[in-house]
Amino acid sequence: WIMGHMVNAIEQVDEFLNLGANAIEFDIDFDENGIAKYTHHGIPCDCGRLCTKSAVFTEYLDNVRQVTSPGDPKFRKELVLLALDLKLQRISSEKAYVAGVDVATKLLDHYWKRGWNGGRAYILLNIPLVEDYEFIKGFKDTLRKEGHEQYNAKVGINFTGNEDLDEIRKVLEKLGEDEHIWQADGITSCFPRGTDRLEKALEKRDTPGYKYISKVYAWTLVRSSIMRRSLRLNVDGVMSNYPDRVVGVLKEKEFADKFRLATYADNPWEKFTSI
């Protein structure tokens, strides 16, 4: 999965897909009551990027629904995963449950259309810190109460704050979640980062019987040398400001026979096993 980073304006969706992304990440900004208002990152953000691009969240969802709906004039078959970077650290943890309810409701109304011609992409809920775990409860409770638990099959969970992997597992156990779990590791592109935690996450992913990590990705990679380093460790995905650079690295002799771009036929919730 090549994840375009910080794709917050509607016009950026096609831009990042044209560069080779098959997944996009966008930031969800909440008001003080936990209501999702805009796709917006804000200052500071990655080096060399404009931090202020934004859209109304519901309008953004309406657009990506079209982009991921076969038969729609805007349809792009390559876009198979939407990563929602939930800026919950900007609001009180007490509002996390309400935020989960609100995001689920808006996805039902504007993305899935409650079963009527909705978008087909998989959804990854990127939650910054384990203390915000109530978001997941609010989200799942809403799908159940609204009679649309079928969408759980499309939804995954990812804690992105580089917290202790065992602490993350404990929270997932508490929630009763042991499927559809990704693990991110990374830092803003402005700073270097070692691979210690990334390697630990990959080791857990590859441990037989370990349920709490099915995919691992590294972020936010801009240098080809760091992309190569991550690929040599066998990550499942790379988040980048420059998807075209990732595409270029994947075409290199070292990687061309080992990796390919994920398509809609690839299940993002299953551990990859080579045939």
From Swiss-Prot:
Keywords: Cytolysis, Dermonecrotic toxin, Disulfide bond, Hemolysis, Lipid degradation, Lipid metabolism, Lyase, Magnesium, Metal-binding, Secreted, Toxin. It comes from the Eukaryota. InterPro entries: PLC-like_Pdiesterase_TIM-brl. GO terms for cellular component: extracellular region. Expressed by the venom gland. Disulfide bonds join C45-C51, C47-C190. SUPFAM superfamilies: PLC-like phosphodiesterases (SSF51695). Mg(2+) binds at E25, D27, D85. This is Dermonecrotic toxin SpaSicTox-betaIIA2. It comes from Sicarius patagonicus (Six-eyed sand spider). The lineage of its organism: Eukaryota, Metazoa, Ecdysozoa, Arthropoda, Chelicerata.
